[in-house]
């Protein structure tokens, strides 16, 4: 039986029973107060965790003009990875397969053809080797594949198998193709593998986790070495976060006794950057101008872990600790009511001309694409494994393992 109108009405009354102590106007006022009085800098228990770079400011520009500005970089490459999602087989194996790809703008068929595949395998069978196998090449050397066996890292093994596959594929692909990038490389997502911090429920620090597991060590080392590689070459490396989910800023504000009527950091910044004008009896959103913040140096949450001292991450690094710190700004697009985050290693952000170039490129791309920059969108499309491909790959794995998927009713009904 589907929902009838009477059901919709009944459900809607539930929302009316929930108290709303803060209306949208009050939320904007609270956000404005936090912006004006709490972020220059914002202090945590061990010092400043968020600091403006060259002053705190909000910037705006007409969307049409930003979209038509000249290109800042002659070429831009993007990199992303996608998976078939964790799948359990009747032989006891939990498997995920990730594909990483790099985009080039302007397009390059050779770059787009290149692929890196990582298959992560977990088993409760203690006799299964928890290590990394050698790389296998195919497609005349354009494809590389590797099987890795994960160990018991966290309570949610599916999350670990999935995360390791994505991170290993993306980071290996980026490192293996780093030398073809001449002007700018953009990761589809944060600069660092921040989900690994969420696996610390059984471990005191990331360094403890790294010391216990070679795969986590490889992931963390790859992303830190990627920064080093691009700093050494003098080519900027950027992380473009399409859907920021962090709550580290909100938690810190709450710990300082400040009101936080927002679910995420992105919701706070969206209220700070949204501009409204009076139209008759209502306030309407200004939709023809992008708004964005200044750059901030961040030690919030996972940012502080990866930008911290060597003993905190468990990996030796070739640059000063401060070079790895995350420096970011956020862009608000009023056409879609979406917020995007742009991350840059401090080693690059120290130079004003680099910050300005990245800022101009990012806002221009968001204005022109009405969403993520074209190199990011292309990398996402290249790396994505669609539903039909997932089904075929799963069938191939069943034949290879000589077993069936350990299915359930949800998978049968919903195809998940």
Tell me the role of every PLM-derived stretch:
Residues 74, 78-125:
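Adenosine ribonucleotide-centric catalytic and binding domains
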Residues 11, 18-20, 105-157:
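Compact, glycine/acidic-enriched structural inserts
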Residues 77-85, 91, 135-164, 186-195:
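Long, hydrophobic/aromatic-enriched structural stretches that serve as scaffold segments
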Residues 1, 21-29:
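Polybasic, low-complexity association/targeting segments
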Residues 53-79, 155-159, 163-169:
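Short linear interaction motifs
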Residues 2-11, 15-17, 36-48, 56-58, ...:
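Long, contiguous domain-sized segments
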Residues 74-76, 182-185, 236:
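Beta-sheet entry/capping signal
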Residues 28-36:
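N-terminal nucleotide/polyanion-binding subdomain common to many enzyme families
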